[in-house]
Amino acid sequence: SAASEVYKRQLGIESIPSESECYPAKLAHGHISWLLNQGVSYIFYPCVPYERKEFDEAGNHYNCPIVTSYGENIKNNVEELADESITYQNPFVSFESDKILADELVRYLGKENNIDAGEIRKAAHKAYEELQKTRNDIRLEGERVLKWMADNNKRGIVLAGRPYHIDPEINHGIPELITSYDIAVLSEDSISHLGKVDRPTIAMDQWMYHSRLYAAASFVRTQN
């Protein structure tokens, strides 16, 4: 894969500030270096502290610290970005709602890039519609798999890790290994809408994907 090639070639490795960072964070350095090597002169890498609040009762809805601020890390560690011929933009924006996202993008892109406010709002709304459509498709597929399991007396496993574990570059083929034994594999976001979490929880579900994990686990415990 492209990500694997970036990693194997060790692109951007000199700008990674800590070995303890997650694999996607390390890849980000390589991708930025790859873009610069291709002569790209404009890079937009926003920081996204808040995710959509998928559960009203959730304690919070942050993204993880990497997603929240990694654009800043890149800016401060990739020396090539100091070149005046490179435009690098990393505003902080929130995905809490399409209106909040659009308002923040209008303030930033309207001022910095002179993009029409109406065009920005339309794009943000369309993006949110597509995001919801994709989420719905994932949930419908989860329900389809659950029905298949019930109809055929099959078992399934919920692979409930971090969001990026869905990437074949990272998960080492574990989903395919499981399905080769005729066991269904579900992601946490394919069934989280079916769960009901007993609240208050012992831990604050600070990040949105934690809320999905708790909801998915709550559903799993109701199944035979």
Where are these regions (language model features)?
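Short, small-residue-biased leader/transition segments that mark boundaries at the very start
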Residues: 2-7
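Beta-sheet entry/capping signal
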Residues: 1, 40-44, 85-87, 155-156, ...
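N-terminal beta-loop-helix "entrance" segment that forms/cooperates
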Residues: 8-25, 194-208
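N-terminal glycine-rich phosphate/adenylate-binding segment common to multiple enzyme folds
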Residues: 15-16, 22-90
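A charged, amphipathic alpha-helical module
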Residues: 92-192
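Short acidic, glycine/serine/threonine-rich loops at helix termini
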Residues: 10-16, 53-62, 99-105, 169-172, ...
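A short, acidic, amphipathic alpha-helical segment used as a generic capping/interface helix at domain edges
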Residues: 28-34, 208-223
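Glycine-rich phosphate/diphosphate-binding loops that line cofactor/substrate pockets in enzymes
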Residues: 36-39, 144-155, 219-223
